[in-house]
A protein has these predicted regions:
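Phosphate-binding/catalytic loop of phosphoryl-transfer enzymes
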Residues: 85-180
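Proline-centered loop/turn at the N-terminus of a beta-strand
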Residues: 76, 105-107, 251
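Glycine-rich beta-strand-to-loop/alpha-helix junction loops that act as flexible
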Residues: 78-85, 130-133, 250-259
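Anionic group-transfer/hydrolysis microenvironments
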Residues: 19, 26, 82, 113, ...
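Short, conserved beta-strand segments within well-ordered enzyme catalytic domains
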Residues: 26, 78-80, 107, 127
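A short glycine/serine-rich beta->alpha loop
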Residues: 44-45, 83, 150-157, 275-279
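ATP-binding/phosphotransfer module of carbohydrate and carboxylate kinases, centering on a glycine-rich
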Residues: 2-74, 98, 119-120, 124-126, ...
Length: 296
């Protein structure tokens, strides 16, 4: 008597969460079995095809090999990234194809859709990104239905780390934050007004410098004037962005380091503006794993 044993092969997928500074490559065959590989960022807005290809070939592939990952076994690739507008997605897909060949299906979408899928799954809701920059949308369970343009840290990006840093520097230099806080800041950072102005107006990426000031803000959040500034930054985000989503339930879901670290202040701002706080994630990867394996 012979028995037939059928082996069920798990679907192998690659989920990529990419920003301008770093990229997380998550190789998974289930939502709780995965391997992470980290590389520099991939952003088609600021990088050429050759630069993106270099990250794939010189960083991702060798590090995947070190982890004994077999890219030939991949069934699907989901790349979510900053700057992945419809007109720029083809260049990203082309760079990925060099690594994974023609077998797997490759999908390239925006970081905002990643946030929406991670936070809301197949339900409708408000999805936000609150990190160095900010973004938001109303998601109907399948796609982005409404979107308020973020506009960057000069014209917009309310609620972001960059705008928080900008408002903090404004308060320190103009004296609207407490004198005690000002003294502690200059003592810890060994800087001056002239140095700060130079970094903001003459450095290559001032938004990153401004966002980095969160390292000072968070440990000193007990200062009343500083906490009020953080809450006000989130309120401005809600007023300028979230109120536009007339169909959405008054529940704010957010992903990103600023949302995660300042959850208490975000919840306070939401309450002041008539909203509740929903799901908060530091990174979208956990939610994306659940989303893609629940919908396989």
């Amino acid at each position: 008597v012979y028995s037939i044993i059928r082996y069920t092969r798990f679907k192998m997928i690659l989920i990529v969460d990419s920003g301008s500074t770093k990229t997380d490559w998550c190789f998974a065959d289930s939502s709780d079995v995965y391997v992470l590989v980290h590389t520099d960022g991939i952003n088609p807005v600021v990088q050429s095809y050759d630069e993106m290809l270099s990250v794939v070939q010189k960083q991702m592939l060798p590090r995947a090999k070190q982890q004994s990952l077999d890219l030939a076994s991949l069934d699907e690739v989901y790349f979510y990234g900053a700057g992945c507008t419809p007109e720029l997605r083809l260049a990203v897909e082309k760079a990925l194809r060099v690594a994974v060949d023609e077998k797997p299906s490759v999908y390239v979408d925006s970081d905002l859709l990643a946030a929406a899928r991670a936070l809301c799954g197949t339900d409708s809701g408000i999805a936000c990104i609150l990190g160095t920059g900010s973004n938001s949308c109303y998601y109907d369970g399948e796609g982005i239905k409404e979107h308020t343009p973020a506009l960057g840290y000069i014209l917009g990006d309310e609620g972001s780390g960059a705008v928080l840093g900008r408002n903090f520097i404004n308060g320190i230099l103009k004296g609207t934050l407490s004198r005690e806080l000002r003294d502690v800041f200059f003592d810890e950072y060994h800087t001056s007004q002239a140095d700060i102005i130079n970094k903001v107006y003459h450095s290559a990426m001032p938004n990153r410098f401004l966002a980095s000031l969160s390292k000072f803000i968070l440990p000193h959040i007990d200062d009343e004037s500083l906490e009020a500034l953080v809450v006000r930054n989130f309120e401005n985000f809600i007023i300028s962005n979230i109120r536009n989503y007339s169909e959405a339930k008054p529940v704010i879901n957010a992903v990103g380091s600023v949302a995660f670290l300042y959850r208490k202040q975000l919840e306070q701002a939401a309450m002041l503006q008539g909203y509740e706080l929903g799901k908060i994630l530091k990174s979208p990867l956990e939610g994306l794993l659940d989303y893609h394996f629940a919908n396989k």
